[in-house]
Amino acid sequence: IEGMAFGIGRAKKFKTYGADASLANGYLSFSPNKVINFQLGHGRHFFGDGYRSLLISDYAPDYPYISGQYYLFNKKILYKHVTSWMKNLERIPASSTPEALFIPKSTSFNILSSSPNSRFSISIFEGGVYKSFDNQNGKINPDVSFFLPIIGAKALDIDSINNIIYGFNWSLLFENLKIYNQIALNPNSSSRGIQAGIKWLNPLKSSNSFLNIEWNTSSSTMFSMNQRQLNQTYSHLGHELAHPLGSGFQEILLRGQFSYKISFIRFLLFRKKIRR
């Protein structure tokens, strides 16, 4: 994409074929006690147990955010919320600055996880992209559910101008085998995405090694929108917030990592099929 460095963000042309881009991330962390943590930062987030995520991944460039996480019942339950501010790749139509700013949008994510034991984990995900700009009024405040760090509050915005996504994730660990599954749902288009994977830990009794096979698929309308939602795409600066392929695809991947004494090998193989 012109004017964009993939995985980094805004870029300017440098000489004939080069690009000049900057990357800065970090966070401030505050924990009033052992079970509560707050963060103010500029970075990315990832949800799930797989190599990919169909809900929120670290593929898109960094963005400013505020987050809080809370452990309950001897850390068997974790609740986390992330409030962030992102941008579309389109610029504000009329601007007083030499270079028009990108159209802003507000995003928030709520995650409720339960780990009754060290082998099983189950989570519920809720995400929303909120309208923060209007061509007539400029920047506007998003709907009230954006400010509520309560899972389930975004149900109020289904069939609205906001883009709401729900998801479900679970994993089960055996002795050295982990199976996991993730489901993404778009209530506005009745579409879904599915992930299923198996990860073999320490194969051949080699430390720091694994072998992972994963399957991902998403319907072509998973992140579809109507005309009112064009500024609320599930993306940031032209990058998908979830799987890099967005929607309308099937993918199977095999990756692994092996080490022996001073030798080390890591690989990733994948095959994809796009359907629009």
Please provide the spans of the model-predicted regions.
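Exposed, low-structure sequence patches enriched in small/polar residues
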Residues: 21, 116-276
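Outer-membrane beta-barrel channel domains
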Residues: 1-121, 128, 203-220, 225, ...
